[in-house]
Amino acid sequence: MWRVLFLLSGLGGLWMDSNFDSLPVQITVPEKIRSIIKEEIESQVSYKIVIEGKPYTANLMQKNFLSHNFRVYSYNGTGIMKPLDQDFQNFCHYQGYIEGYPKSVAMVSTCTGLRGLLQFENVSYGIEPLESSVGFEHVIYQVKHKKADVSLYNEKDIESRDLSFKLQSIEPQKDFAKYIEMHVVVEKQLYNHMGSGTTVVTQKIFQLIGLTNAIFVSLNITVILSSLELWIDENKIATTGDAKELLHTFLRWKRSYLVLRPHDVAFLLVYREKSNYVGATFQGKMCDANYAGGVLLHPRTISLESLAVILAQLLSLSMGIPYDDINQCQCSAAVCIMNPEAIHFSGVKIFSNCSIEDFAHFISKQKSQCLHNQPRLDPFFKQQAVCGNAKLEAGEECDCGTQQNCFLLGAKCCDTATCRFKAGSNCAEGPCCENCLFMSQERVCRPSFDECDLPEYCNGTSASCPENHFIQTGHPCGPNQWVCIDGVCMNGDKQCMDTFGGEAEFGPTECYSYLNSKTDVSGNCGIGDSGYTQCEADNLQCGKLICKYAGEFLLQIPRATIIYANISGHLCVAVEFASDHEDSHKMWIKDGTSCGSNKVCKNQRCVSSSYLGYDCTTDKCNHRGVCNNKKHCHCSASYLPPDCSVQSDTSPGGSIDSGNFPLVAVPARLPERRHMENVYHSKPMRWPLFLFIPFFIIFCVLIAIMVKVHFQRKKWRTEDYSTDEQPESESEPKG
């Protein structure tokens, strides 16, 4: 059963004046007072930090949560994913406590100064380096909700006991340790919100994972960041819609594109200006490859501390740990982590007795097997390429492993000594590499798997296949009754066959009108807190999936209740799954299924299909192609992009994105100026100005010459006149 996290009260932001007090920023200079060094790394360290005029000692132990082969990935201009060459460290992240305060947690990174969070029982302080400081100055600020009247402990609150410093006391027990390997995807809007830079965004994700690890200490769980993916230029899937819809879309993408990326669970982090939801995941599906994932929505008013609480709650739900019943579940902190209100509280948060019991039950089952695998966590100062380790790293063209491994693999393109291509080779592996050479443009590297999907071709200059493209969402498919949604024809008949087998088809209107109007197990428009949701008349075909069954035998579906009804001569069937059944989503009509003329289903309601944003007209591609998800024409065979207006008998069809054409196709004739402006967004015509300038200069020169000639002629006439008069004057008699 999928679970959606709600913000149960009005969202308040840690930095919003309307909901939070104006908090003063203090300047402090942390002082390192002791440390323990193992293998050239500070495994444990203590800092004295002054807060509000009083010194506190933070005892920290190195906490490594990056896998040994951790990479940050992004996409280049052609849509090919590449690892980023970044200089980051995994040995400078620490976790610990404030000396003298047993209910405290410190999570600090020392990579570039001290950056992190100091949590007391019911108040938190953020610390980070002061930019442009000539000393070791840091800013420290209290994360304080306006409604919370909290402060640091007074001296009387400290337990009367020996407060002598023992670094070894913070060493965690390694018995029964569990590990969650997580792949994180940051979509474009959140990337921009976090700073629009790979380094700053990566550091904030490190902080988020560090804070999350501090929460899971009591369960002896380490969240390992196995890889990070940044969608810098564009999102690879649509990130609109509610949390449930986005979760299903992301999981479909995950199953296609993260198959070869090692991880237990994948999370998509999405920015929303405001949202009533903060995330969604499937409960108890942490180790199920098809459902191990979630989406985390980051409203503008949520701080990084609250975001870590949300992530911890989502991961807990994935491990079968539900929300606490506050009347029966207790913990020693001011608020327990699985309390829905926990995101509104500062300070330490731990798991309740109920959560610990639920976690113990989960790890005792076979479905928790992925948590028992301990990944390699070797410290690294910088990602150094190691030739011969069978991993393609920065600066390498290929790496098939040792010479013996390369021989066994039949790798003949890679020089095992230099990890460079051998002479005459331009690739070593990949869907578009054959015999050490790039495949030609006409070779299909990813065939279409659905009538709404599109094939991709090798581009002749890369061993990789172009990113996946599909017909624009909203395009009609099937017998013009259904529409394409994210590359899949949302065919009602196929939904029925997937649920009830090949002898089922989409039910007639009579079946939907009768069963979905009953508002019970046989038909409804969803399940809410108060029970089944009634279908309004317009929404009858968007509730429970009702199919027409023509088989001779009774249906057999494990852990399911089959509902049969004979309506107007049709044998109509529906199904009811338990809430935690992995196929429970099959009970409902899928979003995007047609429910009338220019209408589709969305969240069990029949709405206008305009929300899909389909704007591809038949004229755009000259009736010889379809628009893809980038709104570019994918032409039929024998026609050329970009607008399918030019015929070529040898063309297999395609688009400027499919790989078998250059990014800007050159047609045999120029398209109309109107089309050129639509495609390239040309600026208003300015060329007459550039032609006018030389003519203006020539004109000015001619004017200058004419003026000069005019005055020269005038001078000549004056001189001639003076010459004629002078002899007459000189002939007059003297005297």
Swiss-Prot record:
Keywords of the record: Cell adhesion, Disulfide bond, EGF-like domain, Glycoprotein, Membrane, Phosphoprotein, Signal, Transmembrane, Transmembrane helix
Q: Which residues form the Disintegrin domain?
A: 384-473
Membrane topology reported for the UniProt record: Single-pass type I membrane protein
Q: Which residues form the signal peptide?
A: 1-16
Record-listed Phosphoserine modification sites? S729
The entry's propeptide annotation covers: 17-174
**UniProt topological domain (Extracellular) ranges:** 17-686
Cystine bridges: C287-C370, C329-C354, C331-C336, C445-C465, C616-C627, C621-C633, C635-C644
Protein name (record): Disintegrin and metalloproteinase domain-containing protein 2
Gene that codes for this?
A: ADAM2
